């Protein structure tokens, strides 16, 4: 295969979810294992999430971001101890970037009644919109992609020869975060400005829905030293591994840099669900790992300068 022919594999998960032969599940496990080893990314069809729900989610996303700016700012994630809510354009910038991201975003997670463990658990912030226009479809979608993220973790464990029994403790009370994103039209983006600058995801499994026909995601190919454009296909998800998976798998699964550039005229919408595991869970990708570092400890190191993490919260996750 020439460099020009390189593309992310498209894997059909239906062979794992509803196998028709004794080999179907193992074939999917091996395909996902190989994709995560070679690319750290793959595309996924046959995932079981209705396309009607995907479209409802994207419609709800559009409704949210079309609200007046002053109404959106009332939902600011900076006012929330769990960092749930709205992020305005220009508020994210990574070290080395010339300009901040052009995207707008809205964050939500598990719906817990009180703030616990450094803000990783707690209540969401919901806009004042009719239930059927936002909260209903968004929450249903969150639950569906949460289940899909868990399934991918199960496959990753089996790809390294471990039993899915390890998921019982790992998924006891999982940290699952979701991010709704709107990228502005290229016509209103500054020259050289990215929708999202180059970065690695920091945690576990990412489940990404792209608005069909609105390309923008690019993945870095280290061997070829080039960016690979990932097409935005209808009813096809993009799955990738974060830094936690790469570390815990001993590098057998990759975490790879990626970025977003809106390449088509008009807005571009997407939604990413991040499945990390229980805050007190340790490494299921290597049960014999002597480090015994927990999900919470890893995420605190990543977030301690972004979230309102106080001494009590650090002690709760064993990081004090």
Curated annotation (Swiss-Prot):
Q: DNA-binding as a keyword?
A: no
Q: Where does 2-oxoglutarate bind?
A: 268
The name this protein carries in UniProt is: 2-oxoglutarate-dependent dioxygenase thnC
Q: Which family does it belong to?
A: Belongs to the iron/ascorbate-dependent oxidoreductase family.
Its required cofactor(s), as named, are:
Fe(2+)
Top class in the EC scheme: oxidoreductase
What GO terms are given for molecular function?
Answer: dioxygenase activity; metal ion binding
- GO biological process assignments: small molecule biosynthetic process
Bound how, and how many: what does the cofactor note say? Answer: Binds 1 Fe(2+) ion per subunit.
Q: What is its EC number?
A: 1.14.11.-
């Amino acid at each position: 295969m020439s460099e020009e022919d390189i593309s992310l594999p498209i894997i059909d998960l239906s062979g794992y979810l509803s196998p028709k032969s004794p080999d179907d599940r193992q074939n999917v496990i091996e395909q996902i294992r190989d994709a995560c080893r070679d690319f750290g990314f793959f595309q996924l069809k046959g995932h079981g999430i209705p396309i009607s729900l995907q479209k409802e989610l994207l419609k709800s996303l559009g409704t949210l971001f079309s609200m007046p700016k002053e109404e959106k700012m009332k939902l600011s994630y900076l006012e929330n101890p769990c960092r749930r809510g709205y992020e305005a354009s220009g508020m994210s910038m990574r070290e080395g970037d010339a300009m901040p991201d052009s995207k707008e975003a809205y964050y939500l997670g598990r719906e817990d009644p009180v703030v616990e463990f450094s803000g990783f658990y707690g209540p969401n912030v919901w806009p004042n919109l009719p239930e059927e226009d936002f909260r209903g479809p968004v929450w249903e979608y969150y639950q569906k992609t949460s289940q899909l993220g868990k399934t991918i973790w199960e496959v990753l464990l089996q790809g390294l020869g471990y039993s899915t029994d390890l998921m019982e403790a790992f998924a006891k009370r999982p940290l699952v975060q979701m991010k709704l994103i709107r990228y502005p039209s290229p016509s209103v983006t500054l020259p050289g400005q990215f929708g999202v600058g180059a970065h690695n995801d920091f945690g576990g499994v990412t489940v990404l829905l792209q608005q069909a026909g609105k390309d923008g995601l690019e993945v870095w190919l280290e061997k070829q030293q080039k960016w690979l454009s990932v097409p935005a296909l209808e009813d096809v998800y993009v799955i990738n591994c974060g830094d936690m998976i790469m570390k815990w798998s001993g590098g057998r699964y990759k975490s790879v840099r990626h970025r977003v550039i809106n390449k088509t005229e008009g807005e571009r919408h997407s939604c990413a669900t991040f499945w990390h595991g229980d805050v007190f869970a340790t490494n299921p990708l290597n049960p014999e790992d002597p480090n015994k570092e927990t999900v919470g400890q890893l995420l605190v190191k990543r977030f301690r300068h972004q979230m309102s993490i106080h001494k009590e919260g650090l002690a709760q996750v064993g990081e004090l």
